[in-house]
Every structure is written in C-alpha cells, then in structure tokens.
C-alpha cells in the first residue's frame, strides 16, 4: 500500500473553510485536503483525534494546519500548544482578502479590516462572511500573487499579518 498525503486544515469559522474549498477547486492538487470548522473548541486532543481519524494506514501522512484569526488571545495560547502548522491572520482572515485589493501596513481592528475591504473595490461592497460571489472568487484568483507579495512584507504575528 502506498502512502497517501492528506492535509487537514482546521478552521476557526466558515469563511476560512470556504476559502480552503476554493483553493481545492482551483489547484486540484494530488493530495487530499480536508477542512473542518472547530471554532473555540480547538485543542491538542482535538487536532490529534481528527488527524488519527483521517489515517487509513500507518503509511498515511496527515499534516495538520490551524487557520485562525489572532484577535482572541485565549485562542492563540491554545493554538500554540497544538501539534500543527499555524496559518494565522492578525487581526482576522479578512486581512488576507484585503491584501488582494490593497496594501495594509498599519495596525487595524477586525471591524476596520472589514470596512476597508468593502471600500477597497466594488466587488467587495456587499461582502458577507462565509460566502464568496463568483466575482469575488475571480478577483481572489487573479490577485493572489499580489496578495502574497504584500503579505510577505508584513511582520509575522504583528498586526497586520
């Protein structure tokens, strides 16, 4: 039996999970990507349980990642105690969406990020969490390289990051 590569992305909320599902559709990688929404229930035992549930054989390679906002300090401590890669946004996931439309270098609150996102481009005016319109999906795909470049210039774990 050959090894299967599985990526488990445990998300804080439905918006993050929707984005992970978009990535799966766009890139059609030869690996299995499983997303789960955990919210505040995330813990080392939670990550271990879901990782073990995905293994069919000992050869399976399950890599776990946690996709969370950094705007709640109590959750940040729980995340750091888990055996998983961290995919963190500070203050919130919408910062990643905003970076597709404009640069953001100064500290902002989650509410300010969402307002800036809605003001950044007509495609985002009616942004609603967890649902992306077809135009928003197209915008994200087109501007991902720019967003990556902008994100690379942010300091890890600082606001914004």
Predicted regions span which residues?
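C-terminal accessory helical subdomains adjacent to catalytic cores in phosphodiester-
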Residues: 1-6, 17, 21-37, 51-65, ...
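Structural motif
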Residues: 42-50
């Amino acid at each position: 039996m050959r090894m299967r590569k599985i990526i488990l992305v445990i998300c804080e909320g439905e918006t993050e999970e929707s984005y992970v599902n978009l990535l799966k559709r766009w890139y059609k990688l030869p690996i299995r990507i499983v997303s789960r929404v955990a919210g505040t229930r995330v813990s080392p035992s939670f990550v271990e349980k879901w990782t073990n549930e995905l293994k069919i054989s000992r050869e399976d390679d399950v890599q776990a990642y946690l996709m969370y906002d950094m705007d709640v300090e109590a959750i940040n401590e729980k995340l750091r105690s888990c055996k998983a890669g961290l995919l963190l946004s500070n203050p919130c996931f919408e910062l990643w969406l905003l970076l597709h439309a404009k640069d953001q270098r100064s500290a902002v609150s989650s509410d300010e990020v969402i307002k800036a996102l809605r003001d950044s481009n007509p495609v985002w005016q009616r942004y609603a969490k967890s649902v992306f319109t077809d135009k928003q999906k197209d915008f994200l795909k087109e501007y991902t390289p720019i967003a990556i470049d902008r994100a690379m210039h942010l300091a890890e774990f600082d606001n914004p990051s």
